[in-house]
Amino acid sequence: MKGVLFIVASLIAFATGQDCPAYYVRSQSGQSCYRYFNMRVPYRMASEFCEMVTPCGNGPAKMGALASVSSPQENMEIYQLVAGFSQDNQMENEVWLGWNSQSPFFWEDGTPAYPNGFAAFSSSPASPPRPGMPPTRSWPVNPQNPMSGPPGRAPVMKRQNPPVRPGQGGRQIPQGVGPQWEAVEVTAMRAFVCEVPAGRNIPIGQQPGMGQGGFGNQQPGMGGRQPGFGNQPGMGGRQPGFGNQPGMGGRQPGWGNQPGVGGRQPGMGGQQPGWGNQPGVGGRQPGMGGQPGVGGRQPGFGNQPGMVDNNQAWWTTTRLGNQPGVGGRQPGMGGQPGVGGRQPGVGGRQPGFGNQPGVGGRQPGMGGQQPGMGGQPGVGGRQPGMGGRQPGFGNQPGVGGRQPGMGGQQPNNPNNPNPNNPNNPNNPNPRFNRPRMLQEADALA
């Protein structure tokens, strides 16, 4: 809403070189210019909007303000201006007036509200009768107006309740009867009337315009010191915007040579992150460039990235990067890849899926010192296998025994030259010499 009001006010100030801005009406006294805005906004927003419209010509060096009423004639003139926009020539909307009860002695243009001012507050439970004044709805000039109202309120001008008269439908107000005022909360939504001091004609090229306007600050833009849409434009930052040093919220962030969002230099959260030579997300030099990555010191998607190629089989050792990974110092899925360990793998010191791959062990495998699925692979044992010291699925595979096999110390393989082979008739161990066991059984029988 503020952006819309800023654009409208800038166009008004730029549009004409006459003694009143475009679409403003000069008062009968010739001292002021008025314009009715049928936009419902809170009091403070209406006040800021009117301040952005500066006087035309070289008249009084004052900014615009919400309308200030200093006489019955001015009160009626503003009322008729607003009423002229309705079908029945009656005032339809309540409008803000430029007097805030938090500073009750002055109108917003700087003139005193009283004791020499004018007021037309109605007599109602919301605004009790003024001392010394009868409870009427007349519009007196009040040389000693003590009305200040509760804090956080401002006056609105509205038409008085029309009397019910036959033949007039109960809608007409007698000619010459002006509006009434009522103090309402400044957070309420009302239309408003702006007042600008009238000036003398000057060339259009000298008119104040968008180059010196702003919304809340004295230089153009929206909230920043030099914000806007030029060489140093932006929104909210010191020099942010969409230009040479554009950005949004950072010191020099943006989409240019050093672009970024929120970081000291371009990127997202890191010291040099971004999408450039050293871009990244969250790491010291992470990103998607020469040393890009996600979270690690050198991980990423570049010369040292760590991301498995989905087009390759999982057991191949060729990966996208030499030392890529996610989260570790040199983790990844390449020559020494891994996830979370000091060197590649998952949880172990040198675990992974390569020459010495593993999961969780000191060297590749699953739980053991040298477990894995290669020459000495295994799961859980010190050497490859599942549970035994040298179990696995290779030359010495086994499950659960000290040496490969299924439960025993030696595998059931008659071609195994190992002297502990239970099928070897020369086995000196009677417990595992099957021919000898059969002979002993026959002898006992």
Swiss-Prot record:
Q: List the biased-composition ranges (Pro residues).
A: 414-428
Q: Tell me which residues make up the C-type lectin domain.
A: 29-159
Q: Return the Polar residues bias intervals.
A: 309-321
Please list the coiled coil stretches: none
Which cysteines share a disulfide bond? none
- Region Disordered: start and end of each range? 118-178, 210-445
Keyword tags: Repeat, Signal
Q: Where is there biased composition of kind Gly residues?
A: 210-299, 324-408
Q: Which residues form the signal peptide?
A: 1-15
Q: State the InterPro entries in the record.
A: C-type_lectin-like (IPR001304), C-type_lectin-like/link_sf (IPR016186), CTDL_fold (IPR016187), Pericardin-like_rpt (IPR009765), SM50_spicule_matrix (IPR052890)
**Which tissues is this protein detected in according to the database?**
Expressed specifically in the micromere/primary mesenchyme cells (PMC) lineage.
| Pfam entry (one) | Pericardin_rpt
Keyword Repeat in annotation:
yes
What Gene3D superfamilies does this protein's entry cite?
Answer: Mannose-Binding Protein A, subunit A (3.10.100.10)
Work out whether the entry's keyword set contains Repeat.
yes
**What's the superkingdom here?**
Eukaryota
Task: Outline what the protein does.
Answer: Major matrix protein of the sea urchin embryo spicule. The function of the matrix proteins is to direct crystal growth in certain orientations and inhibit growth in others.
Its family remark reads:
Belongs to the SM50 family.
Its UniProt domain note says: The repetitive domain may provide a calcite binding matrix.
Q: What is this protein called?
A: 50 kDa spicule matrix protein
**To which species is this protein native?**
Strongylocentrotus purpuratus (Purple sea urchin)
UniProt gene name: SM50
